[in-house]
């Protein structure tokens, strides 16, 4: 049995969970999320907790046990607290701003890069160099943050580019020159 999967998921007070077979819907103050879980697990609600159990002891079912428990736990936490991912723009001329809902990033190209947020994700910019991606769906927030970072990933010589807050970049020494 999965060590992660056997832990029950507590349901906070302001969160409502609806189970319909393998379809799980979670509604809370930060929004509403729904997901259909893969075959091999069963989901049940016991008092104020959600319990995920494997339907058999086959390898696939045991593999999916911990995964499904984590997916449901992330949904519950997302609609109650939400998720945020922060990025930093480093380098001369690197700026970001929000126009309407769009994020406009100037990262040293000849043109600014515009990004539309998907449903349920919002962008916020502090002092033109710090971008915050927030939303209820952990997967969507992480994907959008990765797309922003991919515009100009940090380079190893001077560290310029877009990086996650607190991310360490392995630095390389430049050319040593001829002696």
UniProtKB/Swiss-Prot annotation:
Any single GO CC term annotated in Swiss-Prot or TrEMBL for this entry: cytosolic large ribosomal subunit
Biological process according to GO: cytoplasmic translation
Keyword Ribosomal protein included in the entry's annotation: yes
Keywords: Ribonucleoprotein, Ribosomal protein, RNA-binding, rRNA-binding
GO MF annotations in UniProt: rRNA binding; structural constituent of ribosome
InterPro entries: Ribosomal_uL6-like, Ribosomal_uL6-like_a/b-dom_sf, Ribosomal_uL6_a/b-dom, Ribosomal_uL6_bac-type, Ribosomal_uL6_CS
Function per UniProt: This protein binds to the 23S rRNA, and is important in its secondary structure. It is located near the subunit interface in the base of the L7/L12 stalk, and near the tRNA binding site of the peptidyltransferase center.
Family: Belongs to the universal ribosomal protein uL6 family.
NCBIfam families for this protein: L6_bact (TIGR03654)
Subunit: Part of the 50S ribosomal subunit.
Protein name: Large ribosomal subunit protein uL6
Species the sequence originates in: Prochlorococcus marinus (strain MIT 9313)
Gene name tied to this protein: rplF
């Amino acid at each position: 049995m999965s060590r992660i999967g056997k832990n029950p998921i507590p349901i906070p007070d302001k969160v409502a969970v609806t189970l319909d077979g393998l379809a799980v819907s979670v509604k809370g103050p930060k929004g509403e999320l729904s997901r259909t879980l893969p075959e091999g697990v069963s989901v049940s609600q016991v008092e104020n907790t959600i319990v995920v159990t494997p339907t058999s002891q086959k390898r696939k079912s045991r593999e999916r046990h911990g995964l499904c428990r984590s997916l449901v736990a992330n949904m519950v936490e997302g609609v109650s607290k939400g998720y945020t991912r922060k990025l930093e723009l480093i380098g001369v001329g690197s700026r970001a701003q929000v126009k309407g809902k769009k994020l406009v990033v100037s990262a040293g190209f000849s043109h600014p890069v515009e990004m539309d947020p998907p449903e349920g994700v919002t962008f916020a910019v502090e002092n033109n160099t710090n971008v915050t991606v927030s939303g209820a769906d952990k997967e969507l927030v992480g994907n959008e943050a990765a797309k922003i970072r991919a515009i100009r990933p940090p380079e190893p010589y001077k560290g310029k580019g877009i990086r996650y807050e607190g991310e360490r970049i392995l630095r390389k020494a430049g050319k040593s020159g001829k002696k």
